Amino acid sequence: SLLDRLSVLENNGKLWYNIDGYSITSEEFSYPFNEEGLKKVFSKHKISNKDIKTKNSNIHTDNFFVTKNSKIIGDIQQVNNYYFVKNKNNNISVIWFIKARNTDKNMEEELVNMILENKIPKENYSPITPYVINFAGREIKLGGSCYWTALNTVQCPYNGEMNWSIHKDIQDAQNAIDNQLMITKQRKGSEVVAEKMVDVIFEGTPTKAKQVTLKLKGITAALAGMSGGKSLTIYYVAEKVRDRNVSCVMSFWNDDNINPKTKLPPLLEEIMELK
């Protein structure tokens, strides 16, 4: 079900959601759901008069739906689906779905209704500081030195970084890591110097990962040179774990705390071993 794939984080009055490789936010505004209020909220979200606004009858309250594409990088687009909805205070809530491609209207509508009707249990919420994370149904203790850079993206300075999502099927998980790799390859300031498939054991399951080595170049390299981080190793995995379809991207710098035996830093050792 949707709740098995969903994680939520509350931060600065905004709610962040992760599911199926989407990045989603919901925010309540103090403007009433009327023409004047909507005008203000549309302009905050750069929605112009030209943008088509439709009513979605599957949402259980008055609403306007807007979809727009925007550029992520190079020729890679992301889809932005906005639901401007009337909440229980008769004000406007905005639920904004972002995904690189393959959006899922049924899931979006179901989640919007759950958000409006307060049907998401506290178990789906992540702690604001990730001392412990729920990684695809298993609790992992990280201690106090890690932080979220986005929901389901955890950074542990000198110990590695990873992001993950849980998907409705394995193809969607594969698409998610393919998209991340395409975005990485188009980033300015770095270049892919090696790329290969490697055998790994991911959360106890033997599988293949794509291993990519990235070198910084030009001014980026000069800036990073001060901390010694010159090359980044990234692993891309899509696999079924505890009955969940997981996409996961893990990375570390060459000057991180790498265990010479496992060739991995502590965060990555928690979930993967190289064969």
Predicted regions located by residue number:
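N-terminal "mature-domain start" segment
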Residues: 1-35, 39, 117-156, 270-272
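Signature of long, low-cysteine stretches enriched in small and polar/charged residues
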Residues: 7-89, 188-244
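Hydrophobic beta-strand residues in large extracellular and virion-surface proteins
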Residues: 24, 64-66, 82-84, 94-96, ...
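Hydrophobic, Leu/Ile/Phe/Ala-enriched alpha-helical segments that form helix-helix packing faces
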Residues: 38-46, 115, 119, 180-188, ...
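First exposed extracellular module after export/assembly in secreted or surface-exposed proteins
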Residues: 64-81, 86-118, 139-141, 151, ...
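Surface-exposed amphipathic alpha-helical segments
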Residues: 97-140, 144-146, 242-275
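Well-ordered, non-membrane alpha-helical segments in soluble/globular domains
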Residues: 110-113, 176-182, 230-234
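Flexible, glycine-rich surface segments
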Residues: 132-208
